[in-house]
Amino acid sequence: MDVGGDWYDVIETASDRLALVIGDVQGHGVAAAATMGQLRSAVRAFTIGGSTPEQVVRGTNRLLIDLDPGQFASCCYVLLDPTSGRALAARAGHPQPLLRHPDGRAEVLDLAGGVVLGVDPGASYPETELLLEPGAVLALYTDGLVEVPGADIDEGVERLRSALAGARPVPLAE
């Protein structure tokens, strides 16, 4: 069995917001999967406790350093108000999200970010404010989707951006 450290989650908060989370623990196998489970649980606990995106990512960073020194992970955390489309995002060494606008344009976002989790106990993770228009698509992904051996990762990101721009919008009911 092949297991790894990638994870994603959608967490409903008490304030009717949605936390959209994606992360990638270094390595493969049981150790990476175990660390992933701990990080996923930590992110859930910080989120349910009402922490801001920066606090969630900073707290998860500190936890990883304490629990598993030498291990690291990337993470992107977006706290979305689905009614207004407003979101706050924090990023820890994770690939930039993509945004497909309602008119079909797709772009690689330029979110501020900090270092990967597990490296610097004093790291900060600045928040970036986003506004998602009705019909927009926010794409979170791990490097495994866009990495090709021997190729620049930016080429893979561009292929994904192009595919997202060319995708036919489908109502959620379908």
Identify the residue ranges that each predicted region occupies:
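Catalytic-site or vestigial catalytic-site microsegments of nucleotide-handling domains
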Residues: 22-28
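DG-centered beta-turn motif at the end of beta-strands
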Residues: 24, 94, 142-144
